[in-house]
Each structure stands twice: as structure tokens, then as C-alpha cells.
Amino acid sequence: ETKEVMNEDTAAKYRALGWEVFEINGNDVDQIREALDKAKKVEGKPTLIIGKCIMGKGALKADGSSYEANCKTHGAPLGGDAFVNTIKHLGGDPENPFQIFPEVKELYAKRAEELKAICAERYAEEKAWADANPEKAAQQADWFSGKAPKIDWSKCVQKDNDATRSASAACLSVLAQQVPNMICASADLSNSDKTDGFLKQTKALVKGDFSGAFFQAGVAELTMACCCIGMSLHGGVIPACGTFFVFSDYMKPAVRMAALMQLPVKFIWTHDAFRVGEDGPTHEPVEQEAQIRLMEKLKNHSGKNSCLVLRPADAKETTVAWAMAMENTDTPTALIFSR
């Protein structure tokens, strides 16, 4: 049980963060439905539903005794007499364990008709909007197509001998001006990772005003990467996020997920050097590039490299790297820049 490893009051924590919180019996269907209905009515803040559950609820062992709250039910499937006893205990037929009960079939058939009506209404609303706003509708369709945007890279003026993070800022400035559906983020380092090249051409997203295109994520690298994954899954926007390369370690689970899901998120990692100034050895990437390069060589489910990894040597190569990143709509891109 969680009480063996922590005594944190999760509900109080999230209420303090400004969330709506509902605590329920996670094994009670009626309470789950009631909580979901309440959550749909909450506006202006996120909702957390804490369902307190019993592991292996309803499961029985081979001897007929309870298997509930036993950690073995978490990592291994029930088998033999335990499987038979559990199916019987839950009201099913061990000889036909995957049957659909009549009341379930009736419920889903009814819901299917409700959803058809909802979809028809939504499609009608979308068509009416598209007919009234043909230019916006065409732009929306273009954005959701997922194809690479057209960019005039001749507008990107680079300075010789610039550090590649500064060269990246020049590229981001052009992207902010030419790609209206791009959103760039930084983990509290926009001035250092030079994502401020993008920010200077727009403004930050804030509560109540989403006209900007820059997401200030704060010191939350993993959260920032996950948000970018969510944007990519939603579609219609091109997400990019930046931080120091050494902090890519905090993002690694999300980067792996982006690679597994073949999502074209642009990861901007700067300060790839043994000499990164006054920050010292804690900010000097050593093993990080080897990890990312290994990920690049692993094939995804489409048979392609799971990630495009680019480490340009100078300002001109930085422009080419950004062009390749924007043209890559199949996988994540890792852009590694020097200080």
C-alpha cells in the first residue's frame, strides 16, 4: 500500500495548486459516473479524481479465498482455478469468459445512437462554420494535414562565428514570423537557450489570453515535453521546446514516448560543451548525446529511425538543421547546439 512509502496528502496538495479535487471509491461505478459528471461542469481549472481502489478487486485464489490487495495480481495474470473462481465470483461463465451480457449490449447500443446524433450535430456545426469562414477553414485544414510548412529561409540572416544557440535564435525568429501555428516553449531558460528568438516575435501564452505563441513552462522539463507531446497528438500546431542539453535527462521518458508514438516534436537542447561558462560541471553534457544518438538508431514501428538527431557545427549548418527539422513530420527531432 502507498502508506508504506509515503504519507503525502495528495488531495490537499492539488487543492493548494488550485485544482478541483474529488475523492471517491474507485471500485464503485456509480461514484465514478457521479465524479465524471461533476468534473465536466468545472470551469477555469483542471480536475483531479482520486479513486481509492483495491488491487485485484473481486479476485479469488485457487482455494476460493480472497486474492484482493495481493500484489501478485498486479504483475501476473490469473490462471488455473484462480481464473475460474474469479470469473464465477464476478458473475461470468468460465467456459465463455468474454461474453457480452444482454444489459451491456443494450447500454452500448443506446450510447452508440446518442453518439451518432452528437457527431451529426458537430459535423453540421463545423460545416456551417466552414461555409461562413472559407479562408479560415482552408487554413485549419492545412494545419491539421500535418504537412511541413513552407518557409523562406533566405530571410534567416546568420552571423559568422556565432554560437549555434545564437544561430538557432535567428532561425526561431523567422519561424515565429512565418509559421503561425508553431508554439515554442522553454523551461525557464529562454534567454539562455535562445528560444527568446521566437519569443521576441510574439508573446507568452497566459491565462485568459492565448493570442501569443510562446509557452513559459517554468522549471519543469518533463512537464514541458509532455505538454508538447499533447499538442502534437491534438494536431494543428507544431510544438518545440528548449532547455540545456544536460537537463534532457529530466525529459527522457517523454522523449522516448515521442519517439515511440512517432510525433514530430522539436527538442532544442543547448550548451552542449565541456566549457559552458560559470555553471560548472553539473551543466556539462557528457553522456547525453550518446543516449540520444542510440535512440536515433533504433527503428520505430514504421521501420524508420525513431528520432532525427542534428548537431550543427556552425551558424550555416544550424539553418540547414532547422530546415530539416521542420521538414521532418514523421519523428521527433533533437537539435543540439553549443553555448
Please give the residue ranges for each predicted region.
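Glycine-rich ThDP/TPP pyrophosphate-binding loop and its adjacent helix/strand module
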Residues: 1-109, 280, 294, 298-339
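Thiamine diphosphate
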Residues: 105-339
